[in-house]
Amino acid sequence: MNILFCNYEYPPLGGGGGVINALLAEELATRHEVTVLTSQGLGLPAESVVNGVRVVRAPVFFRSQQAAANVPSMLAFLPMGIAAGKRLIKANRYDVINTHFVLPTGPVGAALARFGKLPHVLSVHGGDLYDPSKWISPHRHFVLRTWIKRLLRQADSLVGQSRNTIDNVHTYYDASLDVARIPLGIKRPAVDAARRADYGFTDDQVLLVTVGRLVARKAMDQLISVLKDTDRPDAHLVIIGSGPQEQALQQQSRELGVADRVHFMGQTDERDKFRLLQVSDIFVSTSQHEGFGLVYLEAMASGLPVVCYDYGGQTDFLTDGVTGHVVPLNDTALFTECCRKLISDREASQKISDRNLELVEDLYIENCARQYEQLFEDLIKKQQVQ
């Protein structure tokens, strides 16, 4: 197959949605021709080949951060992405288009599918449908809801990565739509012996670690409060990621008197991210919603128990008392108590760690890619018959 992916964000830009697209594209590129159409910014080249994937970047304007997008740059991607995509379709014979995120990428993928008369698979990731932390979340606005309904209905096939994402499609947009559930996956992490001393930590510290963009939806201010409330001076919080809330979080840690125990590691590469996970003790997340939550899989693959909230796609594979603790949304008192238990009971924590290493075996990228591959092939055959 010759596959064209469309995604507004693709590494190094953006967050988890771009990461999963890259993992999927790279896995499929081992046996197919794969091109990704994405946005250009921050000095990135207009075109490159990354791990066997041809990446074509349409120029956009006003993007100033690697981790977070803005409305002007998203709007600019619509005409620029369509123009770049049409040039690609004229020069190449693609078999299928897979668009990731109904907004802002959906209009680009839909236009290119019509232009090239190609089957169109639209993958929705959660935040493009529903984000409780944002006033501009599409589910709150009639015009955006109407636009999304149209894009969802136009696609030849829809994919959601979790029951929660599919529920949001049906609740806020169109209950009649058929949405395939294909769980996401991660790349199996390399065995890379890491030492705490490499990152300035000691063996007598208890490391709570989190990964994510420092934005409102991640609610990392709660984690800093949780750290203080554990009443464990040996507990430290390791934050991997960057974003617009970093200064406010640093100020909060100073005000609460825990600045010496909150460690902002910034945006790391994959190797350092997994090394930091491997030297930590517990993965924690107070994210208000995740369409799926790749970071939870990364934590499990690193042998960490997970403490998180019960709202989002992670509830498809995380179970309270089995993979760690799944806490009612925003119950910070219970969240803190669960962290205390795992810190205090190292034997129970180790059992959870061992179990998570077993459970994550079904959630690596090769399984996700096989399901997408089958969907693409079925859709192509269906179009050929018609």
Q: Which residues fall in each region the model found?
A:
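N-terminal subdomain of nucleotide-sugar transferases
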Residues: 1-54, 384
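Conserved donor-binding/catalytic core segment of Leloir-type glycosyltransferases
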Residues: 4, 201-218, 224-227
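Nucleotide-sugar donor phosphate/pyrophosphate-binding loop at the beta->alpha transition
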Residues: 118-121, 129-150
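Helix-loop-beta element that forms the nucleotide-linked donor phosphate-binding surface
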Residues: 166-186
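Aromatic "clamp/platform" in nucleotide-sugar-dependent glycosyltransferases that forms part
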Residues: 288
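Short hydrophobic beta-strand element within catalytic cores of glycosyltransferases
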Residues: 305-308, 318
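Conserved acidic donor-binding segment of nucleotide-sugar-dependent glycosyltransferases
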Residues: 320-321, 325-332, 341-346
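A short, well-ordered alpha-helix in the C-terminal region of glycosyltransferases
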Residues: 334, 341, 348-362, 371-374
